Amino acid sequence: MKYDYLIVGSGLFGSVFAYRAKQKNKKCLVIEKRNHIGGNIYCENIEGINVHKYGAHIFHTSNKEVWDFVNSIVEFNRYTNSPIANYKGKLYNLPFNMNTFYQMWGVTTPQQAKEKIEGQKLLAMEAMKKEGIIEPRNLEEQAISLIGTDIYEILIKGYTEKQWGRKCTELPPFIIKRLPVRFIYDNNYFNDKYQGIPIGGYNKLINGLLNDIEVKTDVDFFKNREYCCL
């Protein structure tokens, strides 16, 4: 059978491409290495809850055309990601914003927060210079030079070491290029205008995109090059 397009991978990109191609009367074959479609946004339904197996994934965009498109396939809720960190029984809002700084230091204005952060950064840099350190040698020194000691110790160090399975002093500084800081009272993790998660899970979105399109799972393209000749 002749296909116009062989699409490797049934994640969001591959599924949208197949959907758009089908709208133009192109015949597509989608092959997927895993035993399920959806790529990294695949959901497993556990006890009635759609669990993001490779997640979590929150859809966010400021492009109304993109937002209208995905909502034409499946309805999205208005989930807003506002994480909270628990450090020794005390809660802190993330990402770093004025709510975080109030919880940490009791400051209420951006100027107070900036002075606190800059003061800690200055002390850290002076201590490094006394030891003959010109540039941060590891992630710990890099993070402190960007955000100060308190935020690093409370909200970065433990999480990062758990994530990488190594001490921050053993990790290279380039892992953290920058640390976003907001001097406003806003706990929204993203800055985009439109945010949410598909009602019914991401599988519903992928199924809608791949409706009436031929899909083969458990097919590794690199081990099944014959699909190139279809």
Role assignments for model-derived ranges:
Residues 22-47:
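Glycine-rich FAD pyrophosphate-binding loop
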Residues 47-122:
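Dinucleotide-binding Rossmann-like beta1-alpha1 core, especially the glycine-rich loop
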Residues 27, 50, 75, 214-216:
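Conserved beta-strand segments of alpha/beta enzyme cores
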Residues 17, 40-41, 226-227:
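Short glycine-/acidic-enriched loop or helix-start segments at secondary-structure transitions
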Residues 2-3, 224-230:
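Core beta-strand elements of the Rossmann-like FAD/NAD(P) dinucleotide-binding domain
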Residues 85, 90, 99-227:
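Active-site/ligand-binding neighborhood in enzyme catalytic cores
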Residues 3-30:
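N-terminal Rossmann-like FAD-binding beta1-loop-alpha1 element of flavoenzymes
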